[in-house]
């Protein structure tokens, strides 16, 4: 096991970023669909 405390693998950054983007888009469309997005 190599020490990776000071360096984050790119695949972890890509995975987390992808999940956050998909989550934000999902919340946005869900809010618009339920009518809550109109107040934003």
From Swiss-Prot:
InterPro entries: PSII_PsbJ, PSII_PsbJ_sf
Localization annotation: Plastid membrane
SUPFAM superfamilies in the record: Photosystem II reaction center protein J, PsbJ (SSF161021)
Membrane topology: Single-pass membrane protein
Entry's transmembrane regions: 10-30
Any GO CC annotation of this UniProt entry: thylakoid membrane
UniProt keyword annotation of Plastid present: yes
Keyword field: Membrane, Photosynthesis, Photosystem II, Plastid, Reaction center, Transmembrane, Transmembrane helix
Biological process, per Gene Ontology: photosynthesis
Summary of the function given for this chain in its UniProt record: One of the components of the core complex of photosystem II (PSII). PSII is a light-driven water:plastoquinone oxidoreductase that uses light energy to abstract electrons from H(2)O, generating O(2) and a proton gradient subsequently used for ATP formation. It consists of a core antenna complex that captures photons, and an electron transfer chain that converts photonic excitation into a charge separation.
PANTHER family: PHOTOSYSTEM II REACTION CENTER PROTEIN J
Similarity comment: Belongs to the PsbJ family.
Description of how the protein assembles with itself and partners: PSII is composed of 1 copy each of membrane proteins PsbA, PsbB, PsbC, PsbD, PsbE, PsbF, PsbH, PsbI, PsbJ, PsbK, PsbL, PsbM, PsbT, PsbX, PsbY, PsbZ, Psb30/Ycf12, at least 3 peripheral proteins of the oxygen-evolving complex and a large number of cofactors. It forms dimeric complexes.
NCBIfam families reported in the protein's UniProt record: PRK02565.1
Protein name: Photosystem II reaction center protein J
Species name: Cuscuta exaltata
Top-level taxonomy: Eukaryota, Viridiplantae, Streptophyta, Embryophyta, Tracheophyta
């Amino acid at each position: 096991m190599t020490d990776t405390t000071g360096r984050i693998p790119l695949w972890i950054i890509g995975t987390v970023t992808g999940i956050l983007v998909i989550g934000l888009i999902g919340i946005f469309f869900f809010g618009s669909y339920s009518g809550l997005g109109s107040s934003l």
